[in-house]
Structure formats: C-alpha cells, structure tokens
Amino acid sequence: MKVYPTSKIRNIALVGHGGTGKTSLTEAMIYNVGTTKRLGKVDDGNTVADFYPEEINRKITISTSLVPCEYKEHKINVLDTPGYSDFYFEVAGSLTVADTMVMVLSANAGVEVQTEIIWHDYPDMPKMVYVNKMDRENADFYKSLDDLKNNFSENIVPVQLPIGVEESFKGVVDLITMKAYIFEKETGKVTIEDIPQDMSDDVETYKEALIEAAAEADDDLLTKYLEGEELTDGEIKKGIKEAATNGTAVFVFCGSAINNIAVTPLMDFIVDCAATPEQNQLIKGKDIENEPLAAQVFKTIADPYIGRLNMFRLYTGKLKAETTLYNSAKEKDEKIAQIIIMTGKEQANVAELYPGDIAAVAKLNVTSTGDTLTTKANPVVLEDIKFPIPTLSTAIEPKSKGDEDKLSGAIQRLLEEDPTIRVEKDAVTKQTILTAMGDTHIDIVIEKFARKFGVDVITKEMRIPYRETIRATVEVEGKHKKQSGGHGQYGHVWVKFEPFTEENFLFEENVFGGSVPRQYFPAVEKGLIEAMEEGVLAGYPVANIKATLYDGSYHSVDSSEMAFKMAARLAFRKGMETAKPVLLEPIMNVEVEVPETYMGDIIGDLNSKRGRVLGMEPAGKYQVIKAQVPLAEMAKYTIDLKSITQGRGKFTMEFAQYEEVPAQNADKIIEKAKQEKEE
C-alpha cells in the first residue's frame, strides 16, 4: 500500500445500531475501489471486515476492523464498529481516533437506541448520516429524516434524495451537482441523468436548505445570503465543506449498501468535504508534521500465534520503521520494528507513516490500549480513552481442573485485548469472577477462551460474599484439655466478645495475676483470627468484633501455643452462638442514568430490589438516580435495565458498606448454605 501524506487521509468511523449495514457499507466501499473482486456479504460469511468465527457464526460485528480504502488519490481509513451495546468499548476506541463519524441508519427503522446513545456521548464530533437499506420493505427516507430532526438538535440537512423506494429504489438526486445518479445493482456502475420531473418540488425545497446550511458555516457567505444574493456553486461547496468539518450541519445520504447503490457519492463527499486529520480538535492549528511525535493505541489484538498487535493513530510527527519510541504511560522504551497497515485481518508493511494515519505494530512489550507512544526527548501524554464500565458478573472455572494455569494465562491475554473485562478472585467465596458488558459479551469471552487458548470454561452463579457478626456482648469460656500419655495439651481462656464497628477485628488482653502467661497472648489472637474465617450461621467470614482476653489458666507442662489456639477457637464458637449472630450483606452505591421517561419504572424497580433511592440529578436530557442496593439484588441488573429502558440506560456501582440482612432473607441464605455444604 502507498504511503499517504496527511492531506490525503480521511479517518471515518462507521457507527450505529446493530444490523443497520455498517459492514455491508464497508464491503461496498472496498469493492468499488478494487480491493476485493466480489461484494462481500455478511450472510455469506465472506466479508473482509468480519473475520472472527464468533462474528461469522452470529452474523454480527464484535470487533472493530480497520479497512483502508484507496480512492481518488486519497486513503479513507474506514473503522467498521460493532452496533451491539455489549461491544460499545470498540466504538469508544474508534471514535477517539476518527475525525468524522458516519452514522448508519436503517431506512425502515430510523433512529434506534445505539444511534441515540452514540450521538449523546459524542455531541461535538463531526457527523454524517447514511440512511441505508432503501431497497427494503417499509423503507422511508423522509420519515428517517424527520426522526433525526426530532431526536437531535443539530441542523440535519440531506445532500441526496432517493429515486424510487423499496424494490424500485435505483439511485439518488445529488443536491450539490443537481443531477440524478442511477446505479446498477452490485456493480455500482452509474448513469448520470436529469432530475426526474416529479421530484422538482422536493429538490427545490431541500436544495434551499442545503444552501442555507452552507451559508451559515461562513460569515461572508451568510452575509451575502442574507442580503439576497445568489451563492455560486463554488461558494456552496465551500460552505458545505466548512459545515461538515466544524459540525454546524449533519449531512444526510441514502442508499443500499448490500446492492452497492449510492455508495460512491458518499465516498466522494468524504474525500471532498470530510474533516482532514489536521482539523482534529486535539491538534487543530498545529504544524503536526513537525510537532514532537505522539501516537495513541486505541485497540489491542491478542493472538496466540502472532502475539500482540497494537492499533494506533499517529497524531503528530512522522514515524519510520525500525524506530525506538517511548511509552509515556509506562515510562518504557518500545521498538517499532515494522509499521503494519491492516485491511481486516490482512497485513501489509509500509516504511513510514505520516501524521493522521492509522496503523498497527506487533510485539511491543508493555504497551496497552490507551497508552501514548512518543519520544523520550519530547514526551507527550494524551488523555486516556474513556471506556464504559462493565457491570454484569458471573463466576467462571475451567471445565478441567488441570486447566487452571491455562485459564490464568488466557485471562491475562484477553485483558490486554478488552478493556471492559474485569477478572477478580473473590477472597470470601473463592470464586473467579468475570465482569463484562452483557450476556453476549460473556458468551464471546467464553468462546474466545476455547478458540484462542484451548481452554473450555464453564460459568456458574456468582456467590455473594456475605459476612457474619454479633449483636450482643457475651463472656465465654474456652478450654482445650487432652491427655494421651507423656505431655498433654492444656489451654484455658475466658474471652469477652462484643460488637465493634470501627474495624473488622480488635484483640485486647486484660489479664491480671498471670492466669494466662503473656507468651500465649499471640496464640489466642491467632486462634480467634483463624476461627473468624467461618461463622456459625452459614460459614461466612466474621467481621466487626472486639475480643478481650481477661482470664483463664495454664499448666506448666501441658500448656502450649497450639493448646491456647484451640482454646480460643472453642471460645469463639461458643461466643458466636450466644451473642445473637446475624448475617451481613454488601450494599452497593448505584448510579443509574436514564432518559426522564423511564424514571418511574427505574425507581419502582430499585425499590423492589430492597434499594434506597438517595436522590436524583439532571445530566443533560438524562436523569441520574442515586441509590443504595444490596449486591444480591444487582446480579442481573445489566439485563433488567436494558429491558426496562430498551437499552437506553446505563449504570455504575461500587461497594458502600455491609448491612444486616433482613431476617426473612437471611433464613433462605442460611438454608441454601447448609444445603450446599451437605452436597
């Protein structure tokens, strides 16, 4: 592949709801420039962009693909992103390095949930809209246009109008050139004609809106327009380009990607009018070729055979192969042996890279997603990429006990690849907990363990890390006495147990007259700490207890540290049983962000989960509900929230404190724990 200067590079991210045809649009673009000899189809499993088995089997995109498209002496770096919410982190990474988002809509569905979410999360990014699937039943371009205008405050302006609809859709009227473009299915061959007579009224209306949008992007043009002067074609094009790059208008296109109808006009507009790398807000106004080198990794691919691939955008400076760069996040040098241009899974090397381009590098030692690669002499640190926080947890374990080390290695590799996976070993339940973005995400992770790393993994219900404590103060005796020839065992203690909220455990001694020699105090404390690992109600760890050793007795020959440890354990058991033991559960601070229309349903659902709503505050068009909810009730909240809000809500939660479990709930937990023990 050629090396392209910055001015000839366009970085676009295809985004939108799942199933709108982003991958089909990518395939049509690369087919039109001759990268492929046949038009790849998602249903046939032969696309360049979707190449993982998990994608081919499900017919969905789960991982962003970089597919460069060489067109009219330019390189369009197309980032084909997933549309399903479980893989939103891929969208976040891609929109960090793209200069323009192309929002893809289905003409028969209009604005869908992920469209709303992405638009809401990236309000300042230059946008275009491609209304796809114009050939489908119930396709309606004008309804989609109204949907966009009703949902978003931006100036939504069509650049094209469709010729025909559903099965009769065959092309578009271009409001810039004022010509009709009729396309041959699949080949994309175009015939240019005059505008159909029956479209003249619509064309006139929308052409005027286009001219107005062009004028509003430039003060001189606006003055001329408001004074009633006619703008020239050159001035209109200049204004459209300004509006497209600074985001004052969102231009709308239409077509059928799967049939390759009206794809090249979008490509022409991207080349002619989309923001160039120099116009990226991060570097606008800088001499980017001569600035200190700065690149950011936005995606990592962990492959068991070729190792790790880091995909990055070069923001400033010029990069050559066989260069040593400096990872400013990790403060380590990294050798860039080769600069790799990815086309789906295919790789090609280039000798150098100009600022603004997107590429990959293999076999870096410490670099991960979000890191900045720069020079040691002039280090730069770019802002971290904001990835969504995973919220759905499950316990995992290898199907074969002998694969535990293998699973551990596989987890480390997948953590490199996916910033929205968390894996932790729960100290209380002894389970390995995988937290991800949703149930589909978890399924994909399990499949990757098997396919990439050869380890079969099963999921289990996540156990809640309950604790036990006491509510009363008691004084109890613990005596360990054993005689079996020779030295016996003798330890005898009196211990006072009382509730203590300041910390998990406090041990004090208040022994007078040497009834228990000082040398055995540590053994008593150790015995109590060991005993606290398992409470008397359901076998959960014990917390928030103060223990005071105040009396006892010893034997000059038979007493030992072990004997006093055993005496302490006996005292603890007796004390727990008589000091009104209770079960404690983890309570989480929860923040739920939803459109206002769902407020009542969300509050009702949180109340049904034994939650306490603490307050609400606005966040733009959304409301944030703050609550405290038991962890036991939040296990499937990711799925519940998606169901209640049709995917429009999101939430975060973090540990707040432990609180007593209500009696009716505690009885069920204790009974379940007993059954599990018997099994």
Predicted regions and their residues:
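Structural and coupling elements of P-loop NTPases
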Residues: 1-679
